[in-house]
Amino acid sequence: MPKKRDIEFLYELGSLRNIQRGWRQHFGMDVANDLEHTVRVVWLAMLIARMEGVKNEEKIIKMALVHDMAETRVSDHSYVQKVYVQADEHSAANDLFAGTSFEDLNTDTLKEYEERQCIEAKIVKDADNLDVDLEMRELEQKGSKLPSKWMENRALVRNEKLYTESAKKLWDSLNEVDVDSWHMETNKWNRIPDAGK
């Protein structure tokens, strides 16, 4: 029989869909919620790991899954809010994972991610940063002017905050690929003659 705390954890995990990203305030339009952000961070981290030749995808996936879990209790704060709000993410994570079958993810995986000493932690942090850039491109496609105002700041992140060369190459490539090409160019008449057969 599963532990009660495990079931509670699953419900709390589901609440990530209700946690809006802190920077939504600045864009004035819908942005990905924490759960949506986490899914893309997992895939970005695996892509960076493969580009870097890092083989421990299990560790990377676990880190990516837990990297923002404390936000179920402390929310996600924007760069402006962080000046005034001191969220105790450590205590939130301790309480979140306490009594669950996933306690080791807090004591080991999350701690290792936050220390940023191993390559897997650096890859996940790079993925966390790159998801912001992907979403800004998507918002720009929807008509937001704010992403262009943030380009200088995001270039600084690229040059000074990204750890891996692969993440920097991905960042450089973001503007080269149209946000809509994945669906506009992928159909049985254009690129994949056998699609749908």
Where are these regions (language model features)?
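Alpha-helical, largely C-terminal catalytic domains
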Residues: 1-197
